[in-house]
């Protein structure tokens, strides 16, 4: 039995609240159960120095957790003077995942930065950041198109992510903190709306997992991501 009472293949309740803040070109509060992440997409009409005058744009991401997003207060990374390795790993994952959905030449010589700030953490913050970050990115690109700054939509399609794992010997979908902290295997999967994989990260924590368990986890992720993409589309169709 999962601590939340969910079935092995059941997602937490997912919600995307668009235009959550007023200044960013794209702004989304994404909720996966009790995990809440604010994703904002900001447009800069300059590219990184290494991309200047090359006719291509860039999408990057930054990730952070509020000090009391967890059970006990964490010191701000800014106060420590540097980002931790986990933070750098996660924001690179988010950036790679979102770039997989964008024709960077079609974006033109500009950069979109997607900031993912965890307000409350209950497992799956990186997967929520990718799923919410896509919606914020979509809105930022729509903003550019409405302003006439893009000739065509550079988005290939949707991108979403979810965690899967083995908890008490059973493959499960969308782990919360209680499950994640006790899982025998933890895996993060990123896919697009063409049902293709962008990234798979998996680690055996308790015991090595078998091929049949891997296939079960990937099947759970595939099904869950289809549902997340449907929720993204429903949010974006609200205009």
From Swiss-Prot:
<keyword id="KW-0548">Nucleotidyltransferase</keyword>
<comment type="function">
    <text>Phosphorolytic 3'-5' exoribonuclease that plays an important role in tRNA 3'-end maturation. Removes nucleotide residues following the 3'-CCA terminus of tRNAs; can also add nucleotides to the ends of RNA molecules by using nucleoside diphosphates as substrates, but this may not be physiologically important. Probably plays a role in initiation of 16S rRNA degradation (leading to ribosome degradation) during starvation.</text>
</comment>
<dbReference type="InterPro" id="IPR001247">
    <property type="entry name" value="ExoRNase_PH_dom1"/>
</dbReference>
<dbReference type="GO" id="GO:0008033">
    <property type="term" value="P:tRNA processing"/>
</dbReference>
<dbReference type="InterPro" id="IPR050080">
    <property type="entry name" value="RNase_PH"/>
</dbReference>
<dbReference type="InterPro" id="IPR027408">
    <property type="entry name" value="PNPase/RNase_PH_dom_sf"/>
</dbReference>
<dbReference type="InterPro" id="IPR018336">
    <property type="entry name" value="RNase_PH_CS"/>
</dbReference>
<feature type="binding site">
    <location>
        <position position="86"/>
    </location>
    <ligand>
        <name>phosphate</name>
    </ligand>
</feature>
<dbReference type="GO" id="GO:0016075">
    <property type="term" value="P:rRNA catabolic process"/>
</dbReference>
<keyword id="KW-0819">tRNA processing</keyword>
<comment type="subunit">
    <text>Homohexameric ring arranged as a trimer of dimers.</text>
</comment>
<dbReference type="GO" id="GO:0000175">
    <property type="term" value="F:3'-5'-RNA exonuclease activity"/>
</dbReference>
<dbReference type="GO" id="GO:0009022">
    <property type="term" value="F:tRNA nucleotidyltransferase activity"/>
</dbReference>
<dbReference type="InterPro" id="IPR036345">
    <property type="entry name" value="ExoRNase_PH_dom2_sf"/>
</dbReference>
<dbReference type="GO" id="GO:0006364">
    <property type="term" value="P:rRNA processing"/>
</dbReference>
<dbReference type="GO" id="GO:0000049">
    <property type="term" value="F:tRNA binding"/>
</dbReference>
<keyword id="KW-0820">tRNA-binding</keyword>
<dbReference type="Pfam" id="PF03725">
    <property type="entry name" value="RNase_PH_C"/>
</dbReference>
<keyword id="KW-0808">Transferase</keyword>
<keyword id="KW-0698">rRNA processing</keyword>
<dbReference type="InterPro" id="IPR015847">
    <property type="entry name" value="ExoRNase_PH_dom2"/>
</dbReference>
<dbReference type="InterPro" id="IPR002381">
    <property type="entry name" value="RNase_PH_bac-type"/>
</dbReference>
<dbReference type="Pfam" id="PF01138">
    <property type="entry name" value="RNase_PH"/>
</dbReference>
<keyword id="KW-0694">RNA-binding</keyword>
<dbReference type="InterPro" id="IPR020568">
    <property type="entry name" value="Ribosomal_Su5_D2-typ_SF"/>
</dbReference>
<comment type="similarity">
    <text>Belongs to the RNase PH family.</text>
</comment>
<feature type="binding site">
    <location>
        <begin position="124"/>
        <end position="126"/>
    </location>
    <ligand>
        <name>phosphate</name>
    </ligand>
</feature>
<protein>
    <recommendedName>
        <fullName>Ribonuclease PH</fullName>
        <ecNumber>2.7.7.56</ecNumber>
    </recommendedName>
</protein>
């Amino acid at each position: 039995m999962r601590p939340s009472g969910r079935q092995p293949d059941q997602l937490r309740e997912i919600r995307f609240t668009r235009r959550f803040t007023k200044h960013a070109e794209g702004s989304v509060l994404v909720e996966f159960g009790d995990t809440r992440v604010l994703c904002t997409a900001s447009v800069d009409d300059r590219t990184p120095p290494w991309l200047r005058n090359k006719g291509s744009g860039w999408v990057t991401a930054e990730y952070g957790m509020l000090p009391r997003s967890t059970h006990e207060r964490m010191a701000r990374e800014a106060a420590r003077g540097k980002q931790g390795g986990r933070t750098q790993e996660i924001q690179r994952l988010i950036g790679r995942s979102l770039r997989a959905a964008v024709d960077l030449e079609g974006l033109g010589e500009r950069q979109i930065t997607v900031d993912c700030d965890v307000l409350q953490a209950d497992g799956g913050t990186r997967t929520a950041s990718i799923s919410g970050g896509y919606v914020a990115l979509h809105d930022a690109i729509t903003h550019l198109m409405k302003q006439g700054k893009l000739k065509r939509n550079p988005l290939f399609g949707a991108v979403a992510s979810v965690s899967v794992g083995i908890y008490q010997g059973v493959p499960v979908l969308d782990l919360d903190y209680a499950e994640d902290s006790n899982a025998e295997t933890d895996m993060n999967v990123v896919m697009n709306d063409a049902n293709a994989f962008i990234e798979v990260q998996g680690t055996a924590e308790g015991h090595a997992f078998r091929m049949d368990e891997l296939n079960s986890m990937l099947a759970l992720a595939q099904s869950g991501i289809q549902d997340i993409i449907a929720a993204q589309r429903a949010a974006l169709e609200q205009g």
